[in-house]
Amino acid sequence: MESSNQFLGTERISKLMQKYAIPCIISLLVGALYNIVDQIFIANASYLGSYGNAANTVVFPLTVVALAIAVMIGDGCCAFVSISLGQNEVPKAKRSVGNAVVMCLVSSIVLAALYLIFADNILAVFGGTVNAETYHHSQEYFFYITLGVPFYMFGQAMNPIIRADGNPRFAMISTLAGAVLNIILDPVFIFGLRWGMMGAAVATVIGQLVTAALAVWYLLHMKIIRPEKGDYRLKGSICGRTLTLGMTSFLSQISLVAAMAAINNRIRKYGALDTVFGQEQYAQIPMAVVGIVMKFFQIVISIVVGMAAGCIPIVGFNMGAKKPARVKELFTKLLLAEAAVGVVALVLVEGFPRQLIALFGAANESVYYTDFAVKSFRIYLCMIILACVNKACFIFLQAMGKAVESTALSMVREVVFGVGFALLLPRFFGLDGVLYSMPMSDILTFLIAGYLICKTYRELNQKGEV
């Protein structure tokens, strides 16, 4: 059993990063594509257009709630398993997996039920009432997406657990299979059968079902940490530790939902006061545009989180095995790689915003749509380099078992700064204030993250190699 995971403490760090991070990046990118591909096809369907895009933007935060719960369970279990294997405590690792499966199934069913019961109220909170057409499309899309919530959450929760079992490639393949099927079915349902928002949602749910089915198969054939029957009995200490380790992932996602709710509502309020977007036929444009900008940001963050999350098993094992020098080397290489991703993203948003917009059906829209979209890309994401480094810091601290620091930093970024600036700045700058909330949040968060990065280096230096 030891030989199956000891290479995490001996193999070159750069090679381990390639082995674990690349499949994780692909998995997260593909997972992000579920919603993004829907939005691209919706935007290019002339009978849906910006109304469909706005509806997608309304529903998107609600899928993030499901993702937040799933990654809290999955990432927490992944960190728990990796640390346990580093300490050669395989039975404890197996119990964590069994408990994670049960927690995921129960929470996904409860969440789907709540969504169905309170659908109208939920859509109103996230800005679905901007106009009648947007609300109609939001209702239709949300209903069918909700039916797939249990499949979506199980697939997303199992992904990091599969990586912790030493098989990042299968984790990637299972996600890729579902996403490819979604991409194939989207044009068939939206353009061929003209099912509209229902077609986009059904294609997504079918893809999620395939990913979940593959995850179930792998669960029954795990190499190292396959749970026994008794491991599915919930144990308070293991559930608590798993959820604590995954809390940063949860708060990172759920606080994004809070920020998006604030942003959507500010857009609805201050868009109505704008001379152009206050008109009924243009009211959905700001919400549709900000949704597109967020989708691009999601692609970038999927790469960033993929790099960092892919390193969780490596960090956890080497922390458990008391090899701080390797952890320090990994941290350095990760921060440099994340900053490089941010540089590339910045060049794209500042230099080629019109080309990015074109992917989402700008040819079918008015000049007001295009002009606001260009401005949104250039302002909202102007500090994306700092956003990438901040996100890497959150996840690395989580992987080291520093749940308090990681959780606090994530909460400050998304809730204190993210929601705070989204509510405050529009009072002074109107609709543009919504756009400035993102860079302001990233600048202030980076000041705190920089301190924690330096502190982490000092601690690793003091521990020395055992």
Where are the model-predicted features located?
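Short alpha-helical transmembrane segments in multi-pass integral membrane proteins
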Residues: 1-21, 81-148, 192-247, 315-383, ...
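N-terminal transmembrane alpha-helices
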Residues: 9-48, 61-76, 80, 105-112, ...
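Transmembrane helical elements of multi-pass membrane transporters/channels
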Residues: 19-38, 144, 178, 207-211, ...
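Residue-level hotspots within pore-lining transmembrane alpha-helices
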Residues: 26, 30, 34-37, 66-70, ...
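Short runs within selected transmembrane alpha-helices of multi-pass transporters and secretion channels
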Residues: 27, 144-163, 171-179, 200-213, ...
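Helix-terminus/linker motif at the lipid-water interface of multi-pass membrane proteins
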Residues: 29, 33-54, 123-132, 188-194, ...
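Small-residue hotspots at the loop-to-helix junctions and early N-terminal turns
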Residues: 50-61, 138, 142, 201, ...
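Small-residue-rich hydrophobic transmembrane alpha-helices
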Residues: 53-113, 152-171, 287-347, 351-353, ...
